[in-house]
Amino acid sequence: MTTALSRTSLIRREVNAQTRKVILVLGMHRSGTSAVTRCLNLLGAEIGSKLLPPAADNRSGFWEHADVMAIHEELLKDLGRVWHDARPLPEGWFLSPAARKARDKLARLIAGDFHGSALWAVKDPRLCRFVPLWREVLLESGFEAAALLAAPSAVPSSTSASISLSSPASATAPSGTSCSTS
């Protein structure tokens, strides 16, 4: 019987013989991306060491690189947006000074944290908005990217459960909003 450790070693050896790869785990909050990212990590994908700590609404952990989240947050702020803003990014954002700054920071992060990695994964709900930026940085860094998209069908019930965990006095959505699975 093969142990989990030897399976991980086999996966890493196979990947080392091929192109360096990164898996972009894409999905909104509460869509299962934390579980998917942790599974990828257990199967041998590096995720970095500077991870967001677990929280009351995600006791198993988010499995998100804290610096990636900070870079995304700064870019959103520089573009006049916030994480929960549904508006499109501004016209020409990709060529803006803010995007160039984020691109440089991501390149440094990748070179520092994942330079020796043949396979790694990155997850942050904000990542969906910045895929073009990531594709460019990864290509320049010598990585081939693959995207793994979390199905959004679980989001309403998971979000509802999260709201009730974080605010026991009120498990309902804020006034003027609704969640429906139909």
Go through each PLM region and give its residues.
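PAPS-dependent sulfotransferase catalytic core
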Residues: 2-103
